[in-house]
């Protein structure tokens, strides 16, 4: 039973959240969560919520690809140590993906992001479009990535969202086959890294430290008593946090996968939802789920009836014989694939990251 004090707190909290979101600029929504199961059953899921088609396709990227940070003459340069399967945005950015070592990277919208001013003279630049790819190319584990990123080897360079007059503002989440997790944000021009296995959930606004504080309140109430039900980021964070801990910790990988899919669907926004008074809420266009142990990358579009997967274990990622390949998902990701779609990838010319 909820006492009067809790009811008052709930009312105040709701009012604060409503006021905060009402003043926020238009933003897009996504959710990411990590399931920590027994016997190494680690599963990461994310939803992509966006107001229009992000022209997503899936790509196989082998090791050995030489890349530039696409930030002008003073760009960071590297060669991919690991192969990866990625989901692109507009085929000019990596929005989501997993490498052959089991590291997953996801970028989600965060309107509060403020990146250091890039002058082209000090540290080399890295286009925000390749931020996730840099992690996938260079690191096998979250700990390894965090150790390197703490040294700040580059400066993030952002640009406008394609077709829009606003800057791209993102934060990055990493998870690996051990269940380790990290959230990387840029707040007031400074990099902030939250690194701990317990950081299983990430959504959008507010910043991650504030999300944790709000979630602590809901944990005190208890998810079996009441959970916030709107599509707002803070509510999705609370629901995802409760359910990813509450679902059975299955040794059976397929049952664990079913539970994780049910959670990421629970925090998805109905397709076609248009709420003029809540412009920060957008439809879920697709979902991805990674089984880190079995190295399977699942993809589910809102506009097709099937969930399909890519089996990283069967892919030639070698620098010598591996090939860049693309799975064409079609407009609004409406091409239908079923089961193991790995053989359906076709040889393709490597896409170029959007940069300066």
Ranges and model annotations:
Residues 142, 146-184:
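Aromatic- and glycine-enriched pocket-lining scaffold segments that form the walls
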Residues 1-13:
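Bacterial N-terminal signal peptides that target proteins for export
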Residues 60-77, 114-154, 322-333:
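Compact, glycine/acidic-enriched structural inserts
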Residues 23-29:
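Sec/Tat signal peptide C-region and signal peptidase I cleavage site
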Residues 43-45, 104-107, 173-175, 183, ...:
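Structural recognition of the beta-strand scaffold that forms the well-ordered cores
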Residues 29-43, 67, 157-159, 165-169, ...:
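C-terminus-biased signal that marks the final domain/tail of proteins
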């Amino acid at each position: 039973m909820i006492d009067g004090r809790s009811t008052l707190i709930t009312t105040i909290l709701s009012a604060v959240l409503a006021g905060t979101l009402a003043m926020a600029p238009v933003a897009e929504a996504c959710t990411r969560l990590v399931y920590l199961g027994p016997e190494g059953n680690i599963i990461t899921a994310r939803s992509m919520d966006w107001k229009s088609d992000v022209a997503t396709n899936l790509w196989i990227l082998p090791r050995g690809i030489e890349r530039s940070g696409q930030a002008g003459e003073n760009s960071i340069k590297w060669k991919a140590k690991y192969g990866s399967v990625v989901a692109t945005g507009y085929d000019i950015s990596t929005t989501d993906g997993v490498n052959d070592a089991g590291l997953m990277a996801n970028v989600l919208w965060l309107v509060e992001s403020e990146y250091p001013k890039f002058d082209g003279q000090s540290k080399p630049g890295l286009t925000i479009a390749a931020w996730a790819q840099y992690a996938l190319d260079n690191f096998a584990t979250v700990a390894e990535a965090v150790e390197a990123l703490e040294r700040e080897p580059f400066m993030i360079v952002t640009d406008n969202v394609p077709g829009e007059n606003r800057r791209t503002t993102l934060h990055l989440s990493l998870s690996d086959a051990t269940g380790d997790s990290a959230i990387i944000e840029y707040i007031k021009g400074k990099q902030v890294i939250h690194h701990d296995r317990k950081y299983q959930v990430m959504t959008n606004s507010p910043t991650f430290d504030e999300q944790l504080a709000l979630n602590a309140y809901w944990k005190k109430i208890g998810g079996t008593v009441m959970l916030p039900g709107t599509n707002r980021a803070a509510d999705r964070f609370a629901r995802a946090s409760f359910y990813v801990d509450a679902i059975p910790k299955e040794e059976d990988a397929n049952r664990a996968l079913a539970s994780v899919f049910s959670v990421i669907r629970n925090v998805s926004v109905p397709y076609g939802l248009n709420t003029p008074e809540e412009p920060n809420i957008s439809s879920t266009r697709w979902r991805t789920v990674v089984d880190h142990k079995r190295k399977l990358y699942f993809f589910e579009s809102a506009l097709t009836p099937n969930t399909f997967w890519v089996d990283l274990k069967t892919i030639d990622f070698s620098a010598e014989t591996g090939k860049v390949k693309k799975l064409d998902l079609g407009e609004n990701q409406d091409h239908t694939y079923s089961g193991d779609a790995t053989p359906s990838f076709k040889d393709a010319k490597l896409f170029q990251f959007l940069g300066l």
